[in-house]
Amino acid sequence: MSTVVSEGRNGGNERYSPQDDVSKELPDINGLSLEETMGIPSFDRLPSPTPRYFGSCKWFNVSKGYGFVIDDNTGEDLFVHQSNLNMQGFRSLDEGERVSYYIQERSNGKGKEAYAVSGEVEGQGLKGSRIHPLGRKKAVSLRCFRCGKFATHKAKGCPNVKTDAKVCYTCGSEEHVSSVCPERRRKHRPEQVAAEEAEAARLAQEEADRSSPEENERKDGKLVEQKETETADKAGK
């Protein structure tokens, strides 16, 4: 590399080298953590103080975003956090997935952790877990106890029932509630309903027979016979 001699500010000669400009442009990342160097391009970073290690994922909790990898050389369990995974979107590891990484001491002093985790080839993306947790904001269908429909609204703000009175959410009637709704009973317990209806019909028929003229005459005839028998018994005594 050539060196140029130029006149300095005080009239003296100064030695200039293009390497001087390069050294001025490179950021000083000595003593910075991994998170603090995330904004610095990878080609400007200093080489890692540790060699690249290889291992496989032991387990990974996709809901909490952390897990452990087993190092191939030592068999040691190394903590791994989702923020240190080289992948886009939802970051996770699949059980048994092959990975490469660097090792450093954890900031809380509880063992070692793997960082800059990628595929077996450094910089290669990870496959990730096949399991994704449900989003907290995902719409959940609930049973509205006013209109009876499965929807995202609750009974208090039901848009389908305009009245303030209690209604049956099975058939929509205002005359009864769902617990005694005949439609619900017929739908969910057909055998029991059929037995109850048969018993009710039998009782109604007995009541009708008791009130019919034929039944009254039959009862009157039995009373007459009973009185005659009682009279004959008294006369015989």
Swiss-Prot record:
Summarize the subunit comment: Component of a complex at least containing lep-2, lin-28 and the long non-coding RNA lep-5, which mediates the degradation of lin-28.
Which terms does the UniProt entry file under GO BP? cell fate specification; negative regulation of primary miRNA processing; pre-miRNA processing; regulation of cell fate specification; regulation of development, heterochronic; sex-chromosome dosage compensation
GO CC, sorted alphabetically, is: cytoplasm; nucleus
Which positions bind Zn(2+) 1?
Answer: C144, C147, H153, C158
Compartment(s):
Cytoplasm
Pfam families per UniProt: CSD, zf-CCHC
Annotated GO molecular function terms are:
enzyme binding; mRNA 3'-UTR binding; mRNA binding; mRNA CDS binding; pre-miRNA binding; primary miRNA binding; zinc ion binding
Q: Which family does it belong to?
A: Belongs to the lin-28 family.
- Supply the CDD domains for this chain: CSP_CDS (cd04458)
Q: Where is the composition biased (Basic and acidic residues)?
A: 17-26, 204-237
List of residues binding Zn(2+) 2: C168, C171, H176, C181
Q: Which organism is it from?
A: Caenorhabditis briggsae
List zinc finger spans: CCHC-type. Answer: 143-160, 166-183
Q: What is this protein called?
A: Protein lin-28
Superkingdom of the source species: Eukaryota
- Its chief place of residence is cytoplasm
Q: What does this protein do?
A: Heterochronic protein which controls the choice of stage specific cell fates. Regulates the timing of the second larval stage events (L2 events) in the hypodermis. May negatively regulate the larval to adult transition via the suppression of the microRNA (miRNA) let-7 during L3. Through this regulatory role, controls the timing of the sexual maturation of the nervous system. Plays a role in governing the developmental timing of male tail tip morphogenesis. Plays a role in the control of seam cell number and vulval development.
CSD domain residues = 52-120
| Residue numbers spanned by region Disordered | 1-26, 180-237
Keywords per UniProt:
Cytoplasm, Developmental protein, Metal-binding, Repeat, Zinc, Zinc-finger
